[in-house]
Amino acid sequence: MPAAIQQSQMESDKLSAIKTIDSEIRAIEELKKSLDAESLTKALDFMQNSTGRIIITGMGKSGHIGKKIAASLASTGTPSFFVHPAEASHGDLGMITDDDVVIAISNSGE
């Protein structure tokens, strides 16, 4: 590939990366604006003071994110696992106790 084309492709890739980062920054800023500090503090305190595990659930892309959150929590010492909502009623609900905290993730709100 000629050097000029390679340089042009690198510039295009760089611009694409910058646009992606800018988009992520805007999304995080919007998230920050929408947070209710009191509710967030209560939720974090509830999770921290729980004697059980953190159970994450979600369908589709929310489920993929939930799996990552559960894995990250578990790898940092917080007992956690993911329960797929479509399979929960087929035996997985039996793993959840009254002491556990369940976090349901949904983009649609359903």
Protein language model regions, located:
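Cationic, low-complexity basic patches in intrinsically disordered or flexible, solvent-exposed regions
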Residues: 7
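N-terminal cationic amphipathic segment used for targeting or macromolecule association
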Residues: 1-2, 68
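An N-terminal, well-structured beta->alpha segment
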Residues: 2, 10-50
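Glycine-rich phosphate-binding loops that contact phosphosugars or nucleotide phosphates
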Residues: 48, 52-110
